[in-house]
């Protein structure tokens, strides 16, 4: 629980950094910044955080438990990047699948009757995760590998989504164990 509490302390910082950058560098108005904060609060926080916490635990294991506070903070940032990746993919997935709830609450596109306007929010979350990566890893040698890893994971997940979507119109004979395995593998396995 202590690790989870430490992990949870990082996301408000990342959200604040993102909002500050949007205001200062992109002339985003306060009401729009408030909207983006709401998007991030609603979609990124509130889950079990298993993926993000696994990143922290993996980092600790890779460092043999000899981590500085800076290392732990970077692991947590990377964990939240994965949580943001999941969030933006879920926003889009819920729209495509006409889902009603996610994590026991209305899907984002159902909130305030957003509808397809939520697609832009998904794109914003995606771009903000890359901004967080640059902000916290941009001067580090592993930065380009992390960006490539996130992009590759995104592509694999989107290919899984394509397989899932194509099931809607595929004939029954197309539903094979191989196809199901590919959907499971590509839709969720790579960012989990």
Regions found by a protein language model. Name each.
Residues 26-192:
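Mg2+-dependent prenyl diphosphate-binding active-site environment of isoprenoid biosynthetic enzymes
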Residues 1-31:
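Eukaryotic N-terminal low-complexity, Ser/Thr- and Lys/Arg-rich leader segments
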């Amino acid at each position: 629980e202590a690790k989870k509490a430490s992990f949870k302390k990082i996301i408000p910082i990342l959200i604040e950094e993102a909002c500050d950058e949007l205001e200062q560098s992109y002339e985003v108005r306060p009401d729009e910044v408030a909207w983006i904060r709401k998007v991030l609060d609603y979609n990124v926080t509130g889950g079990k955080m298993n993926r993000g916490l696994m990143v922290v635990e993996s980092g600790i294991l890779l460092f043999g438990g000899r981590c500085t506070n800076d290392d732990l903070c970077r692991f947590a940032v990377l964990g939240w990047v994965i949580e943001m990746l999941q969030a933006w993919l879920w926003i889009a997935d819920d729209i495509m699948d006409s889902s009603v709830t996610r994590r026991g609450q209305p899907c984002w596109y159902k909130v305030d009757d957003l509808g397809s306007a939520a697609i832009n929010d998904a794109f914003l979350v995606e771009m903000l995760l890359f901004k967080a990566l640059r902000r916290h890893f941009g001067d580090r040698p592993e930065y380009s590998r992390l960006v490539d890893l996130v992009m590759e994971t995104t592509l694999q997940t989107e290919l899984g989504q394509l397989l899932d979507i194509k099931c809607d119109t595929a004939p029954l004979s197309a539903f094979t164990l191989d196809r199901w395995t590919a959907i499971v593998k590509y839709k969720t396995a790579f960012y989990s």
